[in-house]
A protein has these predicted regions:
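Membrane-interface helix termini and inter-helical loops of multi-pass transporters
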Residues: 21-32, 87, 136-146, 197-211, ...
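Hydrophobic transmembrane alpha-helices of multi-pass small-molecule transport proteins
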Residues: 47, 117-139, 192, 247-248, ...
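Helix-helix packing/entry segments at the starts of transmembrane helices
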Residues: 36-38, 75, 79, 94-100, ...
Length: 298
């Protein structure tokens, strides 16, 4: 069961690593309101079809209101803020900030779920913050666009932190993961369609190349499937451990950004990213070493 849970988590990480790059490509031809709303609508339709095919009867009354509330937060608000930030930031910037999730999750997991808290998290946090400082020293951080984009990403980071805890709490109940994910997408669709109606240009024609349309098709599935994989994994993996996997977004995200977008990943940025990865992974590695040493002593 744990192997299946970790496999689901790795699949979710793979999708999330490629998403910033795919969003950057789609934004060349599709405006933010249209992109985020269409993704959510088509994703919810796909998930409802899958749920029906595999034999689940969708019943909002049985599911309850919590998955719908979670969907408003994530992927509703988070996808909107994330894609908006991508209009002014590079793809590599976004994956680095999101990889800091384990620190917030270790603290919040301890407060909410009474999960074990390792003091080594603080040492790892210092390394990660130092790595961020090095990373951002390689760009014009105090430019207006950079400040705006990174500010949005920090808001997105906070929303992701809260949503992970809510997901963990919801998935402790006996609700099928596919129905939780479908409910998330439905409520996210409502929020994002309202945003499109109020702030978007409804008369803006969709003139996208075949490559952009193929990217959009990928983005539809990559919005639905990672949340399903993630929700499935969260039944068996603690919050702190689950968020630790997000460190893999850094090397994968950098690789995709360099290959598909031609982003310049300088040595300064690489050094900063490596420090962040070490800082994020170090608490878990130290804890694993202590456990192995204790077993050897016995």
């Amino acid at each position: 069961m744990l192997i299946r849970a970790y496999s689901c988590m790795l699949l979710a990480i793979l999708f999330w690593s490629l998403n910033p790059v795919a969003n950057k490509i789609a934004l060349e031809d599709i405006a933010v309101p249209q992109l985020v709303s269409m993704r959510a609508v088509f994703s919810s339709i796909i998930l409802l079809i899958i749920s029906y095919v595999i034999g689940y009867r969708y019943s909002p009354k049985k599911i309850g209101w919590k998955p719908f509330a979670l969907g408003v937060l994530d992927p509703g608000l988070t996808s909107l803020i994330f894609v908006t930030a991508l209009t002014v930031l590079s793809a590599s910037n976004t994956v680095l900030i999101l990889a800091l999730m384990p620190f917030s999750q270790s603290i919040l997991g301890r407060v909410v779920f009474k999960e074990d808290f390792r003091s080594s998290v603080w040492f790892g946090a210092v390394l990660a913050v130092f790595g961020l400082f090095i990373f951002f020293s390689g760009e014009q951080f105090f430019e207006a666009d950079s400040l705006w984009g990174n500010g949005l990403m920090m808001i997105c980071f906070c929303l992701f932190s809260v949503s992970q805890l809510l997901t963990r709490k919801i998935m402790r109940a006996e609700i099928p993961a596919i129905q939780v994910t479908s409910s998330q997408m439905i409520s996210a669709s409502v929020v994002l369609i309202l945003y499109l109606i109020i702030f978007g240009d409804m008369e803006l024609p969709l003139q996208a190349s075949s490559g952009t349309l193929m990217t959009f098709v990928y983005l539809v599935f990559s919005m639905a499937l990672p949340f399903f994989f993630y929700n499935q994994a969260m039944r068996h993996i603690p919050v702190g451990m689950a968020s630790l996997f997000l460190v893999l977004i850094i090397p994968l995200g950098f690789l995709f950004a360099a290959i598909l977008l031609g982003e310049d990943i300088t040595w300064i940025k690489t050094a900063g990213a490596i420090l962040v990865m070490i800082g994020v992974a170090l608490p878990h590695l130290l804890e694993s070493g202590k456990r192995k040493f204790s077993l050897m002593q016995k």
